[in-house]
Amino acid sequence: MAYTKIHAIKATVDKAIDYICNPEKTDEKMFVSSYACSPETAAYDFKYTLDHCRENSPNKAYHLIQAFAPGEVGFEEAHRIGKELADKLLEGKFSYVVTTHIDKGHVHNHIIFCVADNIEHNKYHDCKQSYYH
């Protein structure tokens, strides 16, 4: 079973996206996907959406990490699961970049998504209690 954790990004969205898209970790970017943005311009896209947001918050994005036990899943399956998680969690409202890192002994996904949705420009509400239900 996968282990998942999430934390807020308050400043360096561009550096976080550069890190998760590292070609050495993602098989030359084979395991990089996105929704409603391009990985190359996601930080700018997120900023544009945030500039139109109704709520003010220090958070610019969220970084979700989904780690699998060694041998639990293959690279392609892990990436598919990461995209499915992002789609289900964000309901097609938030831009995101999902990558699968394959450079360690365990496969793991990184999902960075904009804190403001693309439709009504409302903020994502991170309620940790809801993740356990």
Where do the protein language model's features map onto the residues?
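N-terminal nicking endonuclease/strand-transfer module with a His-rich metal-binding environment
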Residues: 1-133
